[in-house]
Amino acid sequence: MKVNLDRNSSGFCFGVQSTINVAEEKLRKEKGLYSLGDVVHNEVEVKRLEALGLITIDTPAFNELKNAPVLIRAHGEPPSTYETANRNNLTLTDTTCPVVAKLQRTASQLNELGYQIIIYGKHLHPEVIGINGHCQNRALIIKHADLSDPEETLPIDLSKKTALISQTTMDVSGFYELKKNLEKLFSKGGRETGPWAEVKSIGEAEPMPEFIFKDTICRQISNRNQKLQDFSRANERIIFVAGKKSSNGQVLYAICKEANPESHFIEDVEELQSEWFTTTQGKTVESIGVCGATSTPMWLLEKVANHIEAHYA
Protein backbone atom coordinates (compact mmCIF):
# COMPACT_ATOMS: atom_id res chain seq x y z
CA MET A 1 0.00 0.00 0.00
CA LYS A 2 1.23 3.49 -0.88
CA VAL A 3 0.21 6.31 1.44
CA ASN A 4 0.13 9.69 -0.30
CA LEU A 5 0.02 12.89 1.74
CA ASP A 6 -1.48 15.93 0.06
CA ARG A 7 0.84 18.87 0.75
CA ASN A 8 -0.47 21.10 -2.05
CA SER A 9 -4.17 21.59 -1.26
CA SER A 10 -4.36 20.65 2.43
CA GLY A 11 -3.21 22.23 5.68
CA PHE A 12 -3.56 25.68 7.15
CA CYS A 13 -4.43 28.64 4.95
CA PHE A 14 -2.24 31.72 5.46
CA GLY A 15 -4.78 33.42 7.74
CA VAL A 16 -5.01 30.51 10.16
CA GLN A 17 -1.26 29.87 10.01
CA SER A 18 -0.61 33.48 10.97
CA THR A 19 -2.96 33.18 13.96
CA ILE A 20 -1.26 29.98 15.14
CA ASN A 21 2.19 31.54 14.77
CA VAL A 22 1.17 34.57 16.82
CA ALA A 23 -0.44 32.40 19.50
CA GLU A 24 2.67 30.24 19.83
CA GLU A 25 4.94 33.28 20.03
CA LYS A 26 2.76 34.88 22.72
CA LEU A 27 2.62 31.65 24.73
CA ARG A 28 6.40 31.34 24.68
CA LYS A 29 6.67 34.74 26.34
CA GLU A 30 3.75 34.69 28.75
CA LYS A 31 1.11 32.42 30.23
CA GLY A 32 -2.54 33.27 30.61
CA LEU A 33 -3.33 34.15 26.99
CA TYR A 34 -7.05 33.88 26.33
CA SER A 35 -8.66 32.99 23.00
CA LEU A 36 -12.19 34.18 22.29
CA GLY A 37 -13.62 30.98 20.85
CA ASP A 38 -11.66 28.04 19.45
CA VAL A 39 -8.53 29.52 17.88
CA VAL A 40 -9.14 27.20 14.92
CA HIS A 41 -11.96 24.77 14.15
CA ASN A 42 -9.83 21.73 14.86
CA GLU A 43 -10.13 20.18 18.31
CA VAL A 44 -6.78 18.40 18.13
CA GLU A 45 -4.90 21.63 17.38
CA VAL A 46 -6.87 23.51 20.04
CA LYS A 47 -5.85 20.93 22.66
CA ARG A 48 -2.20 21.24 21.59
CA LEU A 49 -2.28 25.00 22.10
CA GLU A 50 -4.16 24.70 25.37
CA ALA A 51 -1.39 22.40 26.59
CA LEU A 52 0.99 25.30 25.90
CA GLY A 53 -1.12 27.59 28.08
CA LEU A 54 -3.84 28.97 25.82
CA ILE A 55 -7.19 29.44 27.60
CA THR A 56 -10.28 29.17 25.40
CA ILE A 57 -13.29 31.19 26.54
CA ASP A 58 -16.77 31.85 25.15
CA THR A 59 -18.48 35.22 24.76
CA PRO A 60 -20.17 35.31 28.22
CA ALA A 61 -16.80 34.61 29.89
CA PHE A 62 -15.13 37.23 27.69
CA ASN A 63 -17.71 39.81 28.76
CA GLU A 64 -16.79 39.20 32.41
CA LEU A 65 -13.02 39.11 31.88
CA LYS A 66 -10.95 42.05 33.15
CA ASN A 67 -7.34 43.19 32.70
CA ALA A 68 -6.18 40.24 30.59
CA PRO A 69 -4.59 39.50 27.19
CA VAL A 70 -6.99 38.10 24.59
CA LEU A 71 -6.34 36.70 21.11
CA ILE A 72 -8.79 37.56 18.33
CA ARG A 73 -8.70 34.63 15.91
CA ALA A 74 -8.65 34.70 12.11
CA HIS A 75 -12.47 34.56 11.86
CA GLY A 76 -12.71 38.14 13.10
CA GLU A 77 -15.14 39.78 15.52
CA PRO A 78 -17.98 42.32 15.49
CA PRO A 79 -17.39 45.87 16.78
CA SER A 80 -19.11 45.00 20.07
CA THR A 81 -16.16 42.76 20.97
CA TYR A 82 -13.73 45.67 20.74
CA GLU A 83 -16.08 47.88 22.75
CA THR A 84 -16.19 45.26 25.52
CA ALA A 85 -12.40 44.96 25.47
CA ASN A 86 -12.05 48.70 25.88
CA ARG A 87 -14.46 48.80 28.83
CA ASN A 88 -12.81 45.83 30.56
CA ASN A 89 -9.21 46.91 29.97
CA LEU A 90 -8.45 43.84 27.86
CA THR A 91 -5.31 43.78 25.73
CA LEU A 92 -6.27 42.43 22.32
CA THR A 93 -3.95 40.70 19.89
CA ASP A 94 -5.97 40.91 16.70
CA THR A 95 -5.15 38.20 14.14
CA THR A 96 -8.23 38.69 11.97
CA CYS A 97 -7.42 37.31 8.51
CA PRO A 98 -6.75 40.21 6.08
CA VAL A 99 -9.30 38.73 3.66
CA VAL A 100 -11.95 38.71 6.40
CA ALA A 101 -11.01 42.22 7.56
CA LYS A 102 -11.49 43.51 4.01
CA LEU A 103 -14.89 41.81 3.87
CA GLN A 104 -15.88 43.43 7.16
CA ARG A 105 -15.06 46.85 5.68
CA THR A 106 -17.09 45.98 2.57
CA ALA A 107 -20.13 45.10 4.70
CA SER A 108 -19.80 48.35 6.63
CA GLN A 109 -19.57 50.41 3.42
CA LEU A 110 -22.59 48.69 1.87
CA ASN A 111 -24.59 49.33 5.01
CA GLU A 112 -23.64 53.02 4.97
CA LEU A 113 -24.80 53.20 1.34
CA GLY A 114 -28.21 51.85 2.35
CA TYR A 115 -28.05 48.41 0.75
CA GLN A 116 -30.00 45.42 1.96
CA ILE A 117 -27.10 43.02 2.48
CA ILE A 118 -27.38 39.30 1.85
CA ILE A 119 -24.54 37.11 3.09
CA TYR A 120 -24.10 33.65 1.59
CA GLY A 121 -22.95 31.76 4.66
CA LYS A 122 -23.78 29.83 7.79
CA HIS A 123 -25.89 31.63 10.37
CA LEU A 124 -23.85 30.77 13.46
CA HIS A 125 -20.39 30.75 11.90
CA PRO A 126 -18.14 33.18 13.83
CA GLU A 127 -16.97 34.88 10.64
CA VAL A 128 -20.56 35.59 9.62
CA ILE A 129 -21.43 36.88 13.09
CA GLY A 130 -18.46 39.23 12.83
CA ILE A 131 -19.35 40.45 9.34
CA ASN A 132 -22.96 41.05 10.35
CA GLY A 133 -21.78 43.07 13.32
CA HIS A 134 -19.95 45.40 10.96
CA CYS A 135 -23.24 46.23 9.22
CA GLN A 136 -25.19 46.75 12.47
CA ASN A 137 -26.55 43.18 12.37
CA ARG A 138 -28.83 44.13 9.48
CA ALA A 139 -27.64 41.50 7.00
CA LEU A 140 -29.77 38.58 5.89
CA ILE A 141 -27.95 35.25 6.06
CA ILE A 142 -28.68 32.62 3.42
CA LYS A 143 -27.10 29.19 3.61
CA HIS A 144 -29.24 27.45 0.99
CA ALA A 145 -28.28 28.61 -2.50
CA ASP A 146 -31.48 27.13 -3.94
CA LEU A 147 -33.56 29.43 -1.67
CA SER A 148 -35.35 26.37 -0.29
CA ASP A 149 -35.61 27.65 3.30
CA PRO A 150 -38.59 30.01 3.80
CA GLU A 151 -37.07 31.33 7.04
CA GLU A 152 -34.17 32.64 4.96
CA THR A 153 -36.22 34.06 2.08
CA LEU A 154 -39.23 35.61 3.84
CA PRO A 155 -37.24 38.52 5.37
CA ILE A 156 -35.97 39.61 1.93
CA ASP A 157 -37.47 42.97 0.94
CA LEU A 158 -37.86 42.92 -2.84
CA SER A 159 -38.33 46.69 -2.93
CA LYS A 160 -34.86 47.49 -1.57
CA LYS A 161 -31.61 47.87 -3.42
CA THR A 162 -29.59 44.78 -2.53
CA ALA A 163 -26.00 43.59 -2.35
CA LEU A 164 -24.83 39.97 -2.20
CA ILE A 165 -21.55 39.01 -0.50
CA SER A 166 -20.23 35.75 0.94
CA GLN A 167 -18.54 34.15 3.90
CA THR A 168 -14.97 33.61 2.71
CA THR A 169 -15.03 29.81 3.07
CA MET A 170 -18.23 29.04 1.17
CA ASP A 171 -18.24 27.27 -2.20
CA VAL A 172 -17.94 29.38 -5.35
CA SER A 173 -20.54 27.43 -7.33
CA GLY A 174 -23.09 27.88 -4.55
CA PHE A 175 -22.47 31.63 -4.46
CA TYR A 176 -23.20 32.04 -8.16
CA GLU A 177 -26.19 29.71 -7.94
CA LEU A 178 -27.57 31.93 -5.18
CA LYS A 179 -26.97 35.06 -7.27
CA LYS A 180 -28.90 33.53 -10.17
CA ASN A 181 -31.78 32.48 -7.91
CA LEU A 182 -31.96 35.91 -6.28
CA GLU A 183 -32.19 37.51 -9.73
CA LYS A 184 -35.14 35.21 -10.49
CA LEU A 185 -36.77 35.90 -7.11
CA PHE A 186 -36.62 39.67 -7.54
CA SER A 187 -37.93 39.41 -11.12
CA LYS A 188 -40.91 37.34 -9.96
CA GLY A 189 -41.56 39.97 -7.32
CA GLY A 190 -41.91 42.64 -9.98
CA ARG A 191 -38.34 43.98 -9.94
CA GLU A 192 -36.85 43.48 -13.39
CA THR A 193 -33.29 43.74 -12.16
CA GLY A 194 -31.63 41.91 -15.02
CA PRO A 195 -28.22 40.42 -14.21
CA TRP A 196 -26.87 41.90 -10.99
CA ALA A 197 -23.79 44.05 -11.45
CA GLU A 198 -20.46 42.80 -10.16
CA VAL A 199 -18.48 45.39 -8.22
CA LYS A 200 -14.80 45.21 -7.36
CA SER A 201 -14.66 48.29 -5.14
CA ILE A 202 -17.46 49.82 -3.12
CA GLY A 203 -18.38 53.45 -3.67
CA GLU A 204 -16.11 54.15 -6.65
CA ALA A 205 -18.88 53.95 -9.24
CA GLU A 206 -21.32 56.88 -8.96
CA PRO A 207 -24.10 56.16 -8.65
CA MET A 208 -23.76 52.54 -7.53
CA PRO A 209 -26.14 50.10 -9.28
CA GLU A 210 -29.21 49.05 -7.29
CA PHE A 211 -28.49 45.33 -7.43
CA ILE A 212 -24.90 44.25 -7.01
CA PHE A 213 -22.75 41.35 -5.94
CA LYS A 214 -19.16 41.11 -4.77
CA ASP A 215 -17.45 37.72 -4.81
CA THR A 216 -15.74 37.72 -1.42
CA ILE A 217 -14.81 34.03 -1.30
CA CYS A 218 -11.13 33.49 -0.48
CA ARG A 219 -9.40 32.21 -3.60
CA GLN A 220 -6.57 30.59 -1.65
CA ILE A 221 -9.27 28.30 -0.30
CA SER A 222 -11.45 27.89 -3.39
CA ASN A 223 -8.44 27.27 -5.66
CA ARG A 224 -7.72 24.14 -3.64
CA ASN A 225 -10.91 22.53 -4.87
CA GLN A 226 -9.71 21.30 -8.26
CA LYS A 227 -6.41 20.06 -6.82
CA LEU A 228 -8.30 18.20 -4.13
CA GLN A 229 -10.59 16.63 -6.72
CA ASP A 230 -7.59 15.43 -8.72
CA PHE A 231 -5.90 14.09 -5.59
CA SER A 232 -9.07 12.22 -4.59
CA ARG A 233 -9.43 10.60 -8.00
CA ALA A 234 -5.75 9.61 -8.03
CA ASN A 235 -6.08 7.47 -4.89
CA GLU A 236 -8.10 4.33 -4.25
CA ARG A 237 -9.28 5.54 -0.84
CA ILE A 238 -9.26 8.95 0.82
CA ILE A 239 -8.82 9.76 4.50
CA PHE A 240 -9.98 13.33 5.03
CA VAL A 241 -8.83 14.91 8.30
CA ALA A 242 -10.66 17.91 9.76
CA GLY A 243 -12.48 19.19 12.82
CA LYS A 244 -16.19 18.50 13.01
CA LYS A 245 -16.80 22.24 13.52
CA SER A 246 -14.89 23.24 10.39
CA SER A 247 -17.15 24.83 7.77
CA ASN A 248 -14.37 24.63 5.20
CA GLY A 249 -13.80 20.99 6.17
CA GLN A 250 -17.40 20.11 5.36
CA VAL A 251 -17.17 21.80 1.97
CA LEU A 252 -13.86 20.15 1.04
CA TYR A 253 -14.93 16.74 2.29
CA ALA A 254 -18.00 16.93 0.04
CA ILE A 255 -15.67 17.65 -2.89
CA CYS A 256 -13.55 14.61 -2.01
CA LYS A 257 -16.62 12.41 -1.59
CA GLU A 258 -18.01 13.45 -4.96
CA ALA A 259 -14.69 12.75 -6.69
CA ASN A 260 -14.09 9.51 -4.76
CA PRO A 261 -17.02 7.82 -2.96
CA GLU A 262 -14.47 5.88 -0.88
CA SER A 263 -13.64 8.98 1.15
CA HIS A 264 -13.77 8.90 4.94
CA PHE A 265 -13.87 11.80 7.42
CA ILE A 266 -11.89 11.65 10.68
CA GLU A 267 -10.67 14.09 13.33
CA ASP A 268 -7.77 11.94 14.55
CA VAL A 269 -6.18 8.50 14.17
CA GLU A 270 -8.51 6.89 16.73
CA GLU A 271 -11.34 7.06 14.19
CA LEU A 272 -9.54 5.05 11.49
CA GLN A 273 -11.28 1.76 10.65
CA SER A 274 -9.40 -1.28 9.37
CA GLU A 275 -12.02 -2.12 6.72
CA TRP A 276 -11.21 1.11 4.89
CA PHE A 277 -7.84 -0.33 3.89
CA THR A 278 -9.00 -3.59 2.34
CA THR A 279 -11.06 -4.37 -0.75
CA THR A 280 -14.24 -6.47 -0.74
CA GLN A 281 -12.00 -9.37 -1.83
CA GLY A 282 -9.90 -8.94 1.31
CA LYS A 283 -6.88 -7.48 -0.48
CA THR A 284 -4.99 -4.44 0.76
CA VAL A 285 -5.87 -1.33 -1.24
CA GLU A 286 -3.10 -0.02 -3.46
CA SER A 287 -3.17 3.67 -2.54
CA ILE A 288 -4.45 5.79 0.33
CA GLY A 289 -4.65 9.56 0.05
CA VAL A 290 -4.49 11.66 3.22
CA CYS A 291 -5.76 15.23 2.94
CA GLY A 292 -7.61 17.83 4.99
CA ALA A 293 -9.11 21.27 5.48
CA THR A 294 -7.58 24.72 5.71
CA SER A 295 -8.04 24.40 9.48
CA THR A 296 -6.13 21.10 9.65
CA PRO A 297 -2.47 21.38 10.74
CA MET A 298 0.11 19.63 8.58
CA TRP A 299 1.56 17.88 11.63
CA LEU A 300 -1.80 16.15 12.16
CA LEU A 301 -1.97 15.04 8.51
CA GLU A 302 1.55 13.64 8.86
CA LYS A 303 0.55 11.87 12.06
CA VAL A 304 -2.40 10.19 10.30
CA ALA A 305 -0.29 9.20 7.27
CA ASN A 306 2.44 7.73 9.49
CA HIS A 307 -0.13 5.84 11.56
CA ILE A 308 -1.65 4.28 8.44
CA GLU A 309 1.77 3.23 7.18
CA ALA A 310 2.67 1.71 10.55
CA HIS A 311 -0.59 -0.15 11.19
CA TYR A 312 -2.33 -0.84 7.88
CA ALA A 313 0.21 -0.82 5.03
Curated annotation (Swiss-Prot):
Catalysed reactions, as listed in the record: isopentenyl diphosphate + 2 oxidized [2Fe-2S]-[ferredoxin] + H2O = (2E)-4-hydroxy-3-methylbut-2-enyl diphosphate + 2 reduced [2Fe-2S]-[ferredoxin] + 2 H(+); dimethylallyl diphosphate + 2 oxidized [2Fe-2S]-[ferredoxin] + H2O = (2E)-4-hydroxy-3-methylbut-2-enyl diphosphate + 2 reduced [2Fe-2S]-[ferredoxin] + 2 H(+)
Keywords: 4Fe-4S, Iron, Iron-sulfur, Isoprene biosynthesis, Metal-binding, Oxidoreductase
Binding site for dimethylallyl diphosphate: 41, 75, 125, 246-248, 295
InterPro entries to which the protein is assigned, alphabetical: LytB/IspH (IPR003451)
Residues annotated for isopentenyl diphosphate binding in this entry: 41, 75, 125, 246-248, 295
CC cofactor: [4Fe-4S] cluster
Name of protein: 4-hydroxy-3-methylbut-2-enyl diphosphate reductase
GO molecular function: 4 iron, 4 sulfur cluster binding; 4-hydroxy-3-methylbut-2-enyl diphosphate reductase activity; metal ion binding
Family: Belongs to the IspH family.
Note describing how the cofactor binds: Binds 1 [4Fe-4S] cluster per subunit.
Binding-site positions, (2E)-4-hydroxy-3-methylbut-2-enyl diphosphate: 41, 75, 125, 168, 246-248, 295
Function: Catalyzes the conversion of 1-hydroxy-2-methyl-2-(E)-butenyl 4-diphosphate (HMBPP) into a mixture of isopentenyl diphosphate (IPP) and dimethylallyl diphosphate (DMAPP). Acts in the terminal step of the DOXP/MEP pathway for isoprenoid precursor biosynthesis.
Pfam families: LYTB
Involved pathway(s): Isoprenoid biosynthesis; dimethylallyl diphosphate biosynthesis; dimethylallyl diphosphate from (2E)-4-hydroxy-3-methylbutenyl diphosphate: step 1/1; Isoprenoid biosynthesis; isopentenyl diphosphate biosynthesis via DXP pathway; isopentenyl diphosphate from 1-deoxy-D-xylulose 5-phosphate: step 6/6
Organism, scientific name: Chlorobium phaeovibrioides (strain DSM 265 / 1930)
UniProt GO BP: dimethylallyl diphosphate biosynthetic process; isopentenyl diphosphate biosynthetic process, methylerythritol 4-phosphate pathway; terpenoid biosynthetic process
Enzyme class: oxidoreductase
Binding site for [4Fe-4S] cluster: 13, 97, 218
Protein encoded by which gene: ispH
Active site: 127
PANTHER family: 4-HYDROXY-3-METHYLBUT-2-ENYL DIPHOSPHATE REDUCTASE (PTHR30426:SF0)
EC number: 1.17.7.4
